[in-house]
């Protein structure tokens, strides 16, 4: 199941739709997660242009009144059969089955809070839900926190946010999926950080052909 994740920073522009469609077609994407979409109305009708066909389904979390946030998960219904949907103000969690492998699992798209308190509360909410679901997990997200000081330019110590993120990953038995080709996923002027990442459990790693 080929997955695409993108902090799109606003989905309103037409060229973004064409870029998404190109990725979906070239990489044969069957699951897509978008965050910071800033959309306040359903884009279900627009998704056909992005996906390229009608064999898809979506789940949406709208942006706030200040046009912040927004999360979208979209998937190929021929590949991934969703049986249950969960969502919060900045995340979507889908229970389902990867059809070709008869692999029951849980796939999530997450956009972390900028502030530590909000992020910690979201992590706790997600942890309780994922432990209750008790299925192999794959999470794609911009968590708005780094895991190690080396993931942020000019960061030299492990702060409280990093420790909480690390403990959350350990509590859920997740593995940080290595990135290839890029070291940082966010930049502003001279500031650079690795905020976007994929996390999965051992069962996903053992079934890497999925």
Task: Identify the meaning behind each predicted range.
Residues 1-210:
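A shared catalytic/ligand-binding motif for oxyanion handling
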